[in-house]
Amino acid sequence: MTDQCVVSAPVRVRTRRLDVKETGALPAYRALAEHFGPDEVYLLESAAGPARDRRHQFVGFGALLSLSVTDRVVRVEGVPALRGLLLERAGALLEDGPQGLRLRTAGGLWPLLRAMRDMFDAEGSASGFRFGFLGFFGYDTARYIEDLPHLIENRPGLPDVRMVLHRGSVVTDLATGRCELLLHESPYWPGLAPETVTGLLADVEQAWPDPSADGFPASAVTDDSAPEVFANDVERCLKHIAVGDIYQVQIGHELSIRSTADPADVYQRLRGRNASPYMYLAGIDGHRLIGASPELFVRIEDGEVTMRPIAGTVPRSGADGGIAAGVRLRSDPKEIAEHTMLVDLCRNDIGRIARPNTLDVPDQLDVEGYSHVLHLVSTVVGRARVDTDAFDTIAALFPAGTMTGAPKIRAMEIIESVERSRRGLYAGALGLLDVGGYTNLALCIRTLFHHEGVYRTRASAGIVADSEPGAEWTETLAKMSATHWAVTGEELL
């Protein structure tokens, strides 16, 4: 908890709000990324889905402070005064190591994140995002919660966890169309004239050309698995299920696509092909994250914790737009059983931090459609206890049971023994954390990771007792079809 950290005077922050002309999220991103650099700009938008998930779009810019943790090694970058203050506050949690500062214990991650949050005296919010951080929680964040085996080789790349404070954002209310420029000001960092940003936005072309019009760049695709290899993996999992080791486990594989395609163009194509509630385009250390996730990991709003687990998937097909496939999905005993099991796991996870008698499942077994697949979706809610915060909630829920299986820890152990490459941010979470408690994190699926001319995308299938290997392989291809097409212009199925 924060009592392990030095409590120095917080950084006072004032937020200026100015109405600006609405430009569209991607054109604004392109203009701001050209000025500030793509590592310092992010785009989050809701392009489809239920109204409760389609509220705002954000384009943040100008990184002031970033905290990254990889294998317990801690890296803090940004404005020197902010960097020094965070290290002062968190010093008791850190020690010197061969690669620099590192966490004394894995569990020290959570008080470290609290130390960063509590540095600021700002107008935060429990009901929406005003001032806070863009947060990335990779799948291996689980290692800061549970003691898990480490059998798959690490590869250089994204950190396990990263939190970034930006100096401002362009926020559009999708219900009203109102667009605001938020600028955060403090004596701790140089000021930024609003005219700098409004001038950039004034020159934006809203009707950006379709990047598919001139065709797609040449690409070369490799897979870290194959149908027969994946079938053997499924059989291994079925043996674990047969002896009662697990009830369900999510296993997958990864495609690597070498291409010269521009990440912003890929995002534009993905958005056009597979508009989703949780879309993102962001940079970390020269990597680009491009996603069209259908699934909420967790939203914390005015003390209410919400998860919307997706479990149960069929390819979208047929002249009726998938209506018949949706009816079959909602009446398939295998899919219903798998979904119910994972909804129960969500209830269990939320119950760890919820007030008594507040758990509820207000929506069950809804069918939601996307470009290539149909999903079964439910909503699970609970009221957070007053002695918990956003980081307690994330630690209690992470990783999403829909990406591991049940029981969760044993499923993660089996995933580590079966899969061939580390998941990275895939199956983790990405989104916004306000200093006032509001949190909105998407589950990182239907995602591309771009670095040095290579795009990687990944998908998993849920293995249960009556799974058929060929069908599960096809499900993974259906889930990767939109991201694969956005880079290559070619269908997987």
From Swiss-Prot:
The keyword Transferase applies. The keyword Disulfide bond does not apply. It holds the Pfam family Anth_synt_I_N. Converts chorismate to 2-amino-4-deoxychorismate (ADIC). This is 2-amino-4-deoxychorismate synthase. Keywords: Antibiotic biosynthesis, Magnesium, Transferase. It catalyses: (2S)-2-amino-4-deoxychorismate + L-glutamate = chorismate + L-glutamine. Its EC number is 2.6.1.86. Its cofactor is Mg(2+). It comes from Streptomyces globisporus.
